[in-house]
UniProtKB/Swiss-Prot annotation:
Source organism: Mus musculus
Physiological role: Transcription factor that is involved in regulation of organogenesis. Seems to be a regulator of SIX1, SIX6 and probably SIX5. Corepression of precursor cell proliferation in myoblasts by SIX1 is switched to coactivation through recruitment of EYA3 to the SIX1-DACH1 complex. Transcriptional activation also seems to involve association of CREBBP. Seems to act as a corepressor of SIX6 in regulating proliferation by directly repressing cyclin-dependent kinase inhibitors, including the p27Kip1 promoter. Inhibits TGF-beta signaling through interaction with SMAD4 and NCOR1.
One GO MF term: DNA-binding transcription factor activity
One Gene Ontology cellular component annotation held by this UniProt entry: Golgi apparatus
Protein name: Dachshund homolog 1
Signal peptide, first to last residue: none
Chain segments carrying region DACHbox-C: 609-689
SUPFAM superfamilies with a match to the protein in the record: Putative DNA-binding domain
The entry's keywords: Activator, Coiled coil, Developmental protein, DNA-binding, Nucleus, Phosphoprotein, Repressor, Transcription, Transcription regulation
Length: 751
């Protein structure tokens, strides 16, 4: 990759020399070294390097002759390497790994517009792994096109097939043996794998999603690393892609995939996690969230929380400045939804120690590691007897974003701090006091500010552990009045005679900002089992602001009153009064000017504290959550009461229906018994009727047979008593039946 000419510092050009007839040098003392063969003279054989080239190579003889010609006849230009074409004029020589002389500047070769190879009169050596030449008279790392072409510098000039080099390799042969998918265990996770030619190959996109997604910017970065590491992944065939889609290893719309062996994946993983895998590359610099370039990242609904007031516009101590820069970096990374790389601390710290000018000029980089490194550097390079440093805004940063540094930490405080300089939260962990229903952006910003406060308080407490308790601490910072139009800090020109070098405590907000006790007694990090975040939320009012300028006379009295105040406030906040303390918390510093001891680095343009505003917002959210919980509880109680009443009504109705059912069953039993009796009586009447019918038939036959009147008279006389008896008996039976029927009708009407 060619570096733009605007970024290259101007180097002194050497006037063109007359042509020299030797091939050992082209401009007096200029020597060209190729990364392919390390010989200044052109070589006839191909270089011993691997990898395809971009175009079909020219014949070796012609390439060598053109290289030799360029080496011999280029006035003021560096000689080309083996198989590479030399530049002419002020453009420098081409890289030795390229077969086409016209591509010399395109593939890591030569200087740019300043004669990186040939314009200098000093010897030039090519960097390892690339054929770019850098002028030794220029110490800038951007004077040669170095880092981006290391993968293409090892190109081969041997005869290759005519197809382009960057075409996709042929996929795996579509055979049943190659298409057999298995789920294997890789670093504790199940990954899809295929066995191709006896080698186990795992799915690269799935492994990227599981292990590399939080380490690099994207899958394209992984492919760039694979090219640099000379690892060629295997291309899946159509059947393997279909199987991987069915397993969920790749997304439904993806129609291509690549496989990689376990060994190559371990190499890739180590390259992604190892900071030393990028030699010569400058550290990445993450911009602040509030910078104009990243303004599109912030949501428009939170202008108050993320206004430039988060970045302190006035004087800070080294600890508070580093903490503010670290918090801005944490917010930036959280808003980008990208985890912080663990190797950033060591890499950036080493980079800042090498380039100390940026740190000493006040360039508080917004990346976490850089802020830690610059804080350490300021602490180490500033003796304790130093008064104060005048902050100088870096040229690349706006004036409002420059973080000035007051007096340094003393050696006791510095020795107590962690090696990286800060106790930084690398991940945004959920907090029990923030409602789950908040938008993600609000939760992220609230967590960032709370971690910011926790970091400042932890550093203050850590510094206090090593300092004597009887020490009188004074601040050398004159706090800027809130209505000051200038964002630059106002520092004292000298120190008072009796003051000691110490870290000015940037305290968090208190429930009574007017109190100005001494800051020599720092609060403990944990008290009564509560974390620092809970105390900073306003649950404990013993977090005190810093001292005033003239507060030295009342030091002892303030010391005793604060001790009594802490003893009063040591009641456990896990009791039900914690809710009342949240409700009764009132931040009284809204309408009045803040005292000088209040942390003015966090002032908004309208004079309000950003921390105070944030805590007020969080308090309002908590109140809303509590009110919602109470309303829901009342609603649940009402619903319970209604359900209970419905249940009682249903129970009464059920009991009534059960009673009615029992009565109906009893009536049914009685009716069935009566029906049986009626059936029996009917059967008896039927039998009696049949008997009478038979007797009547017999009598009629007898009457027909009797001819004489005597016989009829005698028969009549004999039958009369029987007929009378039968009539009386039949009449009695009929009356009984009628009586029973009347009784049945009466009972039926009753029920």
């Amino acid at each position: 990759m060619a570096v733009p000419a605007a970024l290259i510092p101007p180097t002194q050009l050497v006037p063109p020399q007359p042509p020299i007839s030797t091939s050992a040098s082209s401009s007096g003392t200029t020597t060209s070294t190729s990364s392919a063969t390390s010989s200044p003279a052109p070589s006839i054989g191909p270089p011993a390097s691997s990898g395809p080239t971009l175009f079909r190579p020219e014949p070796i003889a012609s390439s060598a002759s053109s290289s030799a010609a360029a080496t011999v006849t280029s006035p003021g230009g560096g000689g080309g390497g083996s198989g590479g074409g030399g530049g002419s004029g002020g453009n420098g020589g081409g890289g030795g790994s390229n077969c086409n002389p016209s591509l010399a500047a395109g593939s890591s070769g030569g200087g740019v517009s300043a004669g990186g190879g040939g314009a200098s009169s000093t010897p030039i050596t090519a960097s390892t792994g690339s054929s770019s030449s850098s002028s030794s008279s220029s110490s800038s790392s951007s004077s040669s096109s170095s880092s981006s072409s290391s993968s293409s510098s090892s190109s081969s000039c041997g005869p290759l097939p005519g197809k382009p080099v960057y075409s996709t390799p042929s996929p795996v042969e579509n055979t049943p043996q190659n298409n057999e998918c298995k789920m294997v265990d890789l670093r504790g996770a199940k990954v899809a794998s295929f066995t191709v030619e006896g080698c186990e190959l795992i799915c690269l996109p799935q492994a990227f999603d599981l292990f590399l997604k939080h380490l690099v910017g994207g899958l394209h970065t992984v492919y760039t690393k694979l090219k640099r590491l000379e690892i060629t992944p295997v291309v899946c065939n159509v059947e393997q892609v279909r199987i991987l889609r069915g397993l969920g290893a790749i997304q439904p719309g993806v129609n291509r995939c690549k496989l990689i062996s376990r060994k190559d994946f371990e190499t890739l993983y180590n390259d992604c996690t190892n900071a030393s895998s990028r030699p010569g590359r400058p550290p990445k610099r993450t911009q602040s969230v509030t910078s104009p370039e990243n303004s599109h990242i912030m949501p428009h609904s939170v202008p108050g929380l993320m206004s430039p007031g988060i970045i302190p516009p006035t004087g800070l101590t080294a600890a508070a400045a580093a903490a503010a820069a670290a918090t801005n970096a944490a917010i930036a990374e959280a808003m980008k939804v990208k985890k912080i790389k663990l190797e950033a601390m060591s890499n950036y710290h080493a980079s800042n120690n090498q380039h100390g000018a940026d740190s000493e000029n006040g360039d508080m980089n917004s990346s976490v590691g850089s802020s830690g490194g610059s804080w350490d550097k300021e602490t180490l390079h500033s003796p304790p007897s130093q008064g104060s440093q005048a902050p100088v805004a870096h040229a690349r940063m706006p004036a409002a974003f420059s973080l000035p540094v007051s007096h340094p930490l003393n050696h006791l405080q510095h020795s107590h701090l962690p090696p990286n300089g800060l106790e930084l939260p690398f991940m945004m962990m959920p907090h029990p006091l923030i409602p789950v229903s908040l938008p993600p952006a609000s939760v992220t910003m609230a967590m960032s500010q709370m971690n910011h406060l926790s970091t400042i308080a932890n550093m203050a407490a850590a510094a206090q552990v090593q300092s004597p308790p009887s020490r009188v601490e004074t601040s050398v910072i004159k706090e800027r009045v809130p209505d000051s139009p200038s964002p630059a800090p106002s520092l004292e020109e000298g120190r008072r005679p009796g003051s000691h070098p110490s870290s000015h405590r940037s305290s968090s907000v208190s429930s009574s900002p007017a109190r100005t006790e001494s800051s020599s007694d720092r609060i403990p990090v944990h008290q009564n089992g509560l974390s620092m975040n809970q105390m900073l939320m306003g649950l404990s009012p013993n977090v005190l602001p810093g001292p005033k300028e003239g507060d030295l006379a009342g030091h002892d009295m303030g010391h005793e009153s604060k001790r009594i105040h802490i003893e009063k406030d040591e009641t456990p906040l896990s009791t039900p009064t914690a809710r009342d303390s949240i409700d009764k918390l009132s931040l009284t510093g809204h309408g009045q000017p803040l005292p000088p001891g209040f942390p003015s680095p966090f002032l908004f343009p309208d004079g309000l504290s950003s921390i105070e505003t944030l805590l007020t917002n969080i308090q309002g959210l908590l109140k809303v959550a509590i009110d919602n919980a109470r309303a829901q509880e009342k609603q649940v109680q009402l619903e319970k009461t209604e359900l209970k009443m419905d249940f009682l009504r249903e129970r009464e109705l059920r009991e009534t229906l059960e009673k009615q059912l029992a009565m109906e069953q009893k009536n049914r039993a009685i009716v069935q018994k009566r029906l049986k009796k009626e059936k029996k009586a009917k059967r008896k009447l039927q039998e009696a009727l049949e008997f009478e019918t038979k007797r009547r038939e017999q009598a009629e036959q007898t009457l027909k047979q009797a001819a004489s009147a005597d016989s009829l008279r005698v028969l009549n006389d004999s039958l009369t008593p029987e007929i009378e008896a039968d009539r009386s008996g039949g009449r009695a039976d009929a009356e009984r039946t009628i009586q029973d029927g009347r009784l049945y009708l009466k009972t039926t009407v009753m029920y």
